[in-house]
Amino acid sequence: MTFANLTCICGLCLLTSMSAAAQIAPPQVPENLQVPNTETVLLKALGKGKQIYVCSAKPGDASQFAWVLDRPQADLIGDKGEAIGKHYKGPVWEAPDGSKVGGQVQARAAAPNANAVPWLLLKAASHDGKGTFSGVTYIQRVDTEGGLAPTTGCDKSHAGAEASTDYQATYFFYGSQTPETPLQSLPYSPSLDLTDMDPSVNPCEDFYRYSCGGWLKKNPIPSDQSSWSVYSKLTQDNERFLWGILEDTAKPNPARSTVEREIGDFFAACMDESAVEKTGAGPVSLELSAIGQLKSVADFPEVLAREHLAQNFGMLFSFSASQDYADSSREIAFAGAGGLGLPDRDYYTKSDAKSEEIRMKYVAHVQHMLELLGGSPAQSAKEARAIMDIETALAKASLTRVEQRDPYKLFHKMDRAQLQALTPALNWTRYLKASGLGELNEYNVTEPAFFKELQTLLAATPLADWKAYMRWHVVHARAAYLSPAFVDANFEFFGKYLRGTPEQRPRWKRCVQYVDGDLGEALGQVFVERTFGPDMKARTLTMTKEIEKAMEDDIKQLPWMSEATKQQALLKLHSVTNKIGYPDKWRDYSSIRIDRADFAGNVERADVFEGRRQLAKIGKPVDRGEWGMTPPTVNAYYDPQMNDINFPAGVLQPPVFDPKMDDAPNYGDTGGTIGHELTHGFDDEGRQFDAHGNLHDWWTEADAKEFQKRADCVADQYGQYTVVDDIKINSRLTLGEDVADLGGEILAYMAWKDATRDQKLSPIDGFTPEQRFFIGFAQWACGDERAESKRVHAITDPHSPPEYRINGVAANMPEFAAAFACKVGQPMVRKDPCRVW
């Protein structure tokens, strides 16, 4: 909502004070003082005056007296020093136009200044008159100074006396935004935005804050998000555009194409909240009934097979098709660890106070979900503890995420007899038959120790505990698709508590995500038709070829690598396949029955379709044209066994890739991302696969040692950075991404310099081309994250936090130091910079 529109509607008289309201950033406040993301700042005012106290008897003890706040008495002052209202008893705020808003305190937080009254969140409780304050919904009081009650002079003899103290505070007045609406076209945002910068920061001290400080002030984390970034905003724009597509295709028009009918009916079923609410736990009743009828562990194979198909292989262990590490041209069966409800095995094994608190809250959540399925509180509590015991045992038997980065630790070929010997209690023949597979005699068992522990558990754990475990995982996997009681409980723990997200996302956002997740290439087909032209694909491919040429030149001149290893590296580089925008062949979903009145059923049928499609690959040649992301996705990836880089259409949009912008920021941003994905083929994990995607050591011993030495330099650097509180980056987990960030930006700089070597480049907006390159690089990463979510990512995410992805790279590049005249001794210049590629 712009204030100009508001003045036309409401006849406001304070245009000079409020004309820039849409540009007022909300303050940084504790979580309990945050305003719902449906609201926006209408007005910011400084309140200066007095807090007036009355000497009164304490409640419940008439012999004791204390100063009690009676009322504020303050003037409201605008940014230019003009009077814009009064603040008085109620509490009430009144504008010169006669409009008033009364507030009711919702939450408070201690002021950083111990000598000041607390910060407050108030909700509008009353309105009077039309004008400035008639649309206000929330008020925040922040940045308080003074105003505390007197400490002396109040006793029985002074009963009724008044005393006042001077105070001032900043007040933010909020009103409802114009509701989010579907987009008919994608909005434009430049890849380099000067207003996103903070010129008060020295780029040689903190380049990330210099480049992104303005963005951070303008873009507080929305209340339905655990983090917010440039990529998040682009994702939301894409989602709003997809929303428009889905609303249109959801209309039962007989002229709809097959693809439009599929995605439209799926979306319509999801948006029918009244129908979903009536289902309760009904959509999982068949699964729960099958679990209830289990007589022994011997009956598990059929139930597990069904749930693996319906839950994407999540219960107890994982079973899937994947490329053979020894021969990437074919798919074989993979059996791996699984069965956990928390995001990572470390949540079960760490002994710090926060981890113990999370486990306690998790058990309470499991209990609550079991109660929603009809269990008594006492029985559900007992079952939740048993479930925690099972999952803890599975977690302790699982590899850490760092260990999983070594493909050799995940490569253990076995025949069926060997797999059966690991878990005698589980009949694999029955499991395969129930999964729709014939007899298989070749498996990669990624973690044999896990299956040994699973056998111990199967033999020792009471059947009743296993039934409780299975019921929990059924409802856990399906919670988001059930009635509101399950949706809300699931969000309360995993969203609000674990990640610190104050509010659930609106229904339309979730439904867009579900369509993209289950019918992604159908939705992507329509997205591409409307957003991604051949010119964008051609430009991206041209830049990719330039980055590949830079990497070829880089490999050839590496002083630390032998000629033998260089030849193998070049062979691998020249074998990389570039996938840009969308797949050459679209997936056919026509065999999925989609019912406009059965949302949960649609989800399950789509998941079973995908599960069967994946399992059908076992024993067959690899389809090298397949994509692992849907076209609207705002992301990119490298696949070490496919040896390909993939850039969906969704990420090739402004501000990430900006055809209107000069080359420098585009190379700094998208060029760096292309280089990043290419470098993944040669990071600590990718380098272990050859040009064909096979797990094969093509390095000389001396070159491998030198690579490790250089990679250790990066790990040592990033291991010093703090994520949140006292938690440091797990730099062995993030090593691949950190190496790719650094290598990718070096390659992008080389390619940009080569592409523009015959051009005379001039400064733009006061910045040299080199400076614009690096600012463009930094601004792709502008973003913020809630503390709770940072803790999750410190354990689970192989990416470093955004500020270190920028500063960590820039500090290692002499080109950056030269561009901004930074000197050794400043934070953004490392005395001994790291470089791998």
Model-predicted regions and their roles:
Residues 18-22:
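Sec/Tat signal peptide C-region and signal peptidase I cleavage site
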Residues 71-84, 88-89, 183-188, 202-206, ...:
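Active-site-surrounding "flap" and adjacent substrate/cofactor-binding loops of secreted or lumenal enzymes
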Residues 24-32, 38-44, 183-212:
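N-terminal module-boundary/linker segments of secreted carbohydrate-active enzymes
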Residues 247-546:
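Noncatalytic, helix-rich "gating/capping" subdomain that lines the substrate-entry/channel surface
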Residues 7-17:
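Bacterial N-terminal signal peptides
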Residues 23-52, 59-178:
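Primary mode marks residue(s) on the alpha4-beta5-alpha5 output face of response regulator receiver
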Residues 235, 387, 393, 422-425, ...:
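Intrinsically disordered, low-complexity linker/terminal regions across diverse proteins
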Residues 43-60, 196-217, 348-372, 735, ...:
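Hydrophobic/aromatic-rich, well-ordered segments within soluble, folded domains that form packed cores
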